[in-house]
């Protein structure tokens, strides 16, 4: 099984990256061939509306824009599992997450019947890390983020969403203008909860990457 893990956070060692590295190890634990990509390292744009993927003269299930993201999309569509993680900024995943989703999903979407040109099956794990507590996610973010899950359903397999709540933004809040947050409470919460989130990310990575016999 081929698993591609994509970090759509600009931070390579903080919450989202740690969650994804745990999912990566979970995938490896069941024998998957795993590739890890930091999305902020590559030159990319969102969908440029060139519509070449919708032309009657071109091959379907392919993004034709010439930048570093197109070959990654090609590898994703040849893989078996996609694990993507993003922090939540102003209630939404990052712009890089959005760019990936736009171009990956648009190039497989049929404008004849709104079905999917993609005939394979790609399991998807979506990991969102956020400063917000669980009640805010439930009341404000969850319904909106569910739309992303609906789009990834066009890849014809399982889609699992895992939110990580009340994360630490920095190690030492006293160095920043962040007095709205209770550092002691956040650190205590993360001390107890974040290891559980890492374990769950490992489990999801393994579950989605496990070869069905």
Model-derived features with residue positions:
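Structural signal for conserved beta-strand scaffold positions within catalytic alpha/beta enzyme cores
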Residues: 36-38, 65, 126, 161-164
């Amino acid at each position: 099984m081929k698993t591609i893990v994509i970090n759509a956070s600009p931070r390579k060692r903080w919450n989202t990256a740690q969650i994804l590295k745990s999912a990566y190890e979970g995938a490896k634990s069941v024998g998957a061939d795993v590739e890890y990509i930091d999305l902020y390292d590559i030159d990319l744009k969102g969908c440029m509306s060139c519509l070449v993927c919708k032309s009657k003269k071109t091959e379907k299930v392919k993004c034709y824009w010439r930048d570093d993201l197109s070959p990654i999309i090609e590898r994703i569509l040849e893989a078996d599992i996609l694990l993507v993680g993003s922090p939540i900024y102003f209630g939404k995943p990052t712009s890089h997450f959005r760019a990936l989703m736009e171009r990956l999903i648009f190039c497989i979407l049929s404008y004849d019947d709104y079905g999917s040109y993609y005939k394979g099956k790609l399991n998807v794990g979506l990991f969102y890390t956020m400063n917000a507590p669980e009640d805010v996610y439930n009341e404000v973010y969850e319904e909106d983020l569910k739309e992303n899950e609906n789009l990834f359903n066009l890849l014809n397999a399982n889609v699992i969403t895992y939110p990580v709540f009340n994360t630490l933004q920095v190690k030492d809040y006293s160095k920043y203008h962040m007095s709205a947050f209770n550092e002691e409470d956040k650190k205590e919460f993360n001390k107890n909860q974040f290891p559980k989130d890492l374990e769950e990310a490992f489990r999801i990575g393994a579950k989605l990457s496990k070869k069905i016999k």
